[in-house]
């Protein structure tokens, strides 16, 4: 199945974070645009999360340990790990969640596979 990122609708996750979702039978792919200074509150989820920083600088805190991520860096957040974040600059991030996030599926995006 084929799709173009420009054809995927965007939705607002929380203030300062907009995302486009691609859902498959096994995963959710989230293309996130975060505005500089936008804060992602502390949370956890049962899915493993892989975050790939495409543009910008992002401060990710996992289990109270802060990491400053830059373009090209990848970080794996284990299932159920408490984490939060802050966009230091405008950011473009690819997040991959396994298994699929039903809560994000309800927000929209497209289903492939």
Task: Name every feature range the model reports, one short phrase each.
Residues 48-58, 63:
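Glycine- and acidic-residue-biased ligand/ion/polar-headgroup-sensing regions
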Residues 28, 57-59, 66, 82, ...:
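Structural motif
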Residues 64-79:
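Short acidic-glycine-tyrosine-enriched beta hairpin
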Residues 1-26, 109-113:
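A short, N-terminal "cap"/entry segment at the start of jelly-roll beta-barrel domains
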Residues 79-103:
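Ligand-binding loop in jelly-roll beta-barrel domains
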Residues 30-44:
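Conserved short histidine dyad/triad with adjacent acidic residue
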Residues 54-55, 70-71, 89:
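A cytosolic small-molecule/anion-sensing beta-strand core signal
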């Amino acid at each position: 199945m084929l799709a173009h990122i420009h054809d995927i609708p965007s939705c607002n996750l929380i203030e300062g974070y907009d995302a486009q979702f691609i859902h498959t039978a096994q995963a959710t792919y989230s293309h996130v645009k975060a505005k500089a200074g936008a804060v992602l509150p502390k949370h956890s989820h049962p899915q493993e999360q892989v975050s790939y920083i495409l543009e910008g600088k992002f401060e990710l805190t996992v289990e109270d340990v802060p990491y400053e991520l830059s373009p090209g860096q990848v970080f794996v957040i284990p299932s159920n790990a408490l984490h939060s974040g802050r966009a230091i600059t405008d950011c473009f991030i690819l997040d991959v969640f396994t298994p699929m996030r039903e809560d994000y599926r309800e927000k929209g995006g497209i289903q492939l596979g």
